[in-house]
Amino acid sequence: MKSLTSFVINEASSEIIDKMKNALKEELNAWYGYIIVKEWLEGTDRKDIEKFYEDTAKDELEDHGYWLMKRINQLGGTIEDITISPNSWKDANHKYISPTWKNGNIDIKKSIEDNIINEEGAIETYRELVKLTDGVDPASNSKLKKILADEEEHLQELKDFLEDIK
């Protein structure tokens, strides 16, 4: 017979894994969006925004996404459905917003506005995960707080860029 403690932990682990899988989809969507805009900004006079998009794409994939993949596996989840088929990314709670084009070029103002929406969604997701892992999974909770801080920093930088180009 299972103890109540192990049942609660298992239930919490299942919910944590599901939320982490959603966060992974959001991170992959974010990486894709940032890298596309970065490539289209290459050669423009906004090297600062191009550098932000390049660095943020790396954060989303190499730090956040990779950690989520490892942690989901460590907790007993699987990621094959997410990593093998980018079509599964569209099931994320916060959807990818594709870059907006204007006269054959990226509309940088609109792209920044869209990325602000994406970062706000990521912040919401990570706040939920931080709350969910608090007192249940200290290792995940610590890293999730760091990722949340990164997402809040990304949001502020995007808002600063938006203010600068208005």
Regions found by a protein language model. Name each.
Residues 2-11:
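Proteolytic processing junctions in secreted/extracellular precursors
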Residues 15, 44-55, 107, 139-146:
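A structural signal for alpha-helical segments
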Residues 19-26, 30-33, 37, 66-71, ...:
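Acidic/histidine-rich alpha-helical segments that form the ligand environment
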Residues 37-89, 158-162:
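Conserved alpha-helical segments that form or flank metal/cofactor-binding pockets of metalloenzymes
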Residues 150, 164-166:
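Structured surface interface patches that mediate subunit assembly and partner/cofactor docking
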Residues 153-157:
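Vicinal oxygen chelate
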